[in-house]
């Protein structure tokens, strides 16, 4: 089977080709219809990402090279794409640690994060001998088994119960929940998972610096259908393997860029 990815480069935001790409995306964004401003929950996602990146920086030296340029092959065509990594540690010349940060109230966001990291590992393995991956999950209301039981007892219960985190972990044997950074599995085939609460983020960033005023109207507005597991992506993508939809686990910049890119041209690089 032909490789799905090729010609990767690990770059920073000053890369000339990447800057030209972003300019193209922002021009496309200007031509799109006006969109609603981000909700507090979406803003919190970006704030939580910044807080956890700062937390990681107290333990590791984070690299500015956290953008991956690569070709994705589909049949006889190849499309240039870009993928932003939330945090990168270049501990050795041929070793890299990649962190994916998610703030979500849906357990299924873990499945998407794991798939994104699996693809990232496949791409970066062409550059590095060892690629370790970790998900930092901020739980903003993932239902417990008791929550699901109460929900399904209601008259207007959904037709399908939302999965709990334990249920999702049960179908992802290569995702291991770790109690701390030091307790992570060193096996590069394993995706490690560290779970954080909203209170943990408040302790890191301070409640006054976070958007925490989530009301029922906002929660209802974000109750959208789950996207397909492997959606067809646009020709150019800021992050790939993610559907170009609004979700509570998107940070505002990435969501805006993905929305702007949804009408991009296709073609060979």
Q: What is the predicted function of each stretch?
A:
Residues 229-269:
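OB-fold/S1-family RNA-binding modules
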Residues 1-228:
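Intrinsically disordered, low-complexity Ser/Thr/Pro/Gly-rich regulatory segments
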């Amino acid at each position: 089977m032909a490789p799905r990815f090729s010609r990767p480069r690990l770059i920073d935001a000053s890369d000339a080709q990447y800057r030209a790409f972003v300019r193209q995306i922002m021009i496309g964004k200007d031509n799109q219809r006006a969109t609603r401003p981000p909700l507090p929950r979406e803003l919190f996602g970006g704030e939580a990402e910044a807080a956890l990146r700062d937390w990681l920086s107290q333990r590791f030296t984070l690299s500015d090279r956290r953008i991956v340029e690569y070709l994705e092959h589909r049949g006889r065509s190849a499309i240039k794409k870009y993928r932003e990594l939330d945090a990168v540690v270049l501990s050795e010349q041929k070793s890299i640690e990649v962190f994916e940060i998610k703030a979500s109230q849906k357990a299924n966001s873990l499945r998407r994060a794991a798939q994104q990291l699996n693809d990232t590992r496949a791409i970066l393995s062409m550059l590095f001998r060892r690629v370790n991956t970790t998900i930092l999950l901020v739980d903003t209301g993932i239902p417990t088994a008791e929550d699901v039981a109460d929900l399904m007892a209601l008259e207007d219960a959904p037709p399908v119960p939302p999965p709990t985190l334990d249920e999702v972990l049960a179908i992802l044997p290569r995702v291991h929940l770790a109690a701390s950074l030091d307790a992570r599995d060193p096996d590069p085939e394993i995706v490690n998972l560290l779970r954080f609460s909203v209170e943990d983020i408040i302790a890191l960033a301070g409640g006054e610096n976070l958007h925490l005023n989530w009301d029922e109207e906002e929660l209802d507005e974000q109750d959208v259908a789950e996207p397909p597991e492997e959606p067809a992506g646009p020709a150019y993508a800021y992050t790939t393997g993610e559907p170009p939809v609004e979700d509570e686990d998107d940070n505002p910049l990435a969501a805006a860029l993905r929305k702007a890119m949804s009408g991009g041209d296709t073609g060979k690089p």
